[in-house]
C-alpha cells in the first residue's frame, strides 16, 4: 500500500476499523478514517422513520463504536422532530424494548439480508464512501459518526465527528446512558481483539509515496 504523506485515507474494506488501525501503523503521518458506523446510523434512521411514518431526514439517531455486532445504538438521544423516541413510543402505548430488539437486529444483520435477497451489498457502502469523500474534498465540516483512532480506547472506532479536508477535525463524544457507555467500552474491547487477530497475520510492509 502506498499513500501520500498528507493524504486522507478512507478504509472501506470490511472489517474497516481494525484495518484502519493497520493502515495508520503502516503509513505513519497519513490521516486514516474508516467508514465505521456511518452506514449503520443511516439505516437506524431509516428504520425509525418507517416505524413512525416520518421522513428519515428529520430523525436524529446514531450508532457508535464498532461496525459490527458490538455496535452501540444511542436510543437515549434518538429523536424525531426534537421529540425523544422513548416519549413517542409512550404516547402510542408501545414498549421500547420490543422495537429495540427488532430494529437493532435488522440494522446489525442488514448486509446478510441484502445479500440473501439481491446477491450483493456494495451499493450502500459505495454511496456512503462517496459521500465521505465529498465531505473531505469540499471541507464540508459535516457532523457524522465515522471511524477514527481514539487514544482513549486504543483503537479506531466511530463517534460523532466534524469531517473536513484534514479528515476528522474534532470528535464530539455524545452524552450517553450508563448502559450505552458500557456498551461502547465492550465494543472497544471487541475491536482490540479483532486488531490483535489482524496483527497476528503476516503482511507486506507498506511504503509512503
Language-model segments: which ranges?
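Rossmann-like NAD(P)(H) cofactor-binding subdomain of soluble oxidoreductases
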Residues: 1-47
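Long, compositionally biased stretches enriched for glycine and/or charged residues
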Residues: 50-209
Amino acid at each position: 500500500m502506498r499513500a501520500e504523506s498528507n493524504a486522507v485515507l478512507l478504509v472501506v474494506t470490511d472489517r474497516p476499523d481494525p484495518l484502519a488501525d493497520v493502515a495508520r501503523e503502516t503509513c505513519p503521518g497519513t490521516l486514516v478514517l474508516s467508514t465505521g458506523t456511518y452506514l449503520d446510523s443511516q439505516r437506524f434512521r431509516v428504520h425509525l422513520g418507517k416505524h413512525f411514518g416520518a421522513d428519515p431526514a428529520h430523525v436524529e439517531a446514531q450508532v457508535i463504536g464498532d461496525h459490527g455486532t458490538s455496535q452501540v445504538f444511542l436510543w437515549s438521544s434518538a429523536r424525531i422532530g426534537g421529540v425523544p423516541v422513548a416519549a413517542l413510543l409512550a404516547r402510542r402505548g408501545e414498549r421500547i424494548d420490543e422495537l429495540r430488539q427488532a430494529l437493532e437486529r435488522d440494522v446489525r444483520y442488514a448486509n446478510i439480508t441484502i445479500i440473501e435477497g439481491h446477491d450483493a451489498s456494495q451499493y450502500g457502502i459505495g454511496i456512503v464512501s462517496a459521500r465521505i469523500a465529498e465531505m473531505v474534498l469540499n471541507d464540508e465540516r459535516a457532523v457524522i459518526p465515522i471511524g477514527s483512532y481514539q487514544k482513549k480506547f486504543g483503537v479506531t472506532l466511530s463517534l460523532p465527528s466534524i469531517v473536513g479536508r484534514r479528515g476528522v477535525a474534532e470528535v464530539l463524544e455524545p452524552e450517553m446512558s450508563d448502559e450505552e457507555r458500557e456498551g461502547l467500552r465492550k465494543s472497544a474491547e471487541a475491536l482490540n481483539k479483532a486488531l490483535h487477530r489482524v496483527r497476528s497475520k503476516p503482511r507486506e510492509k507498506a511504503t509512503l509515496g
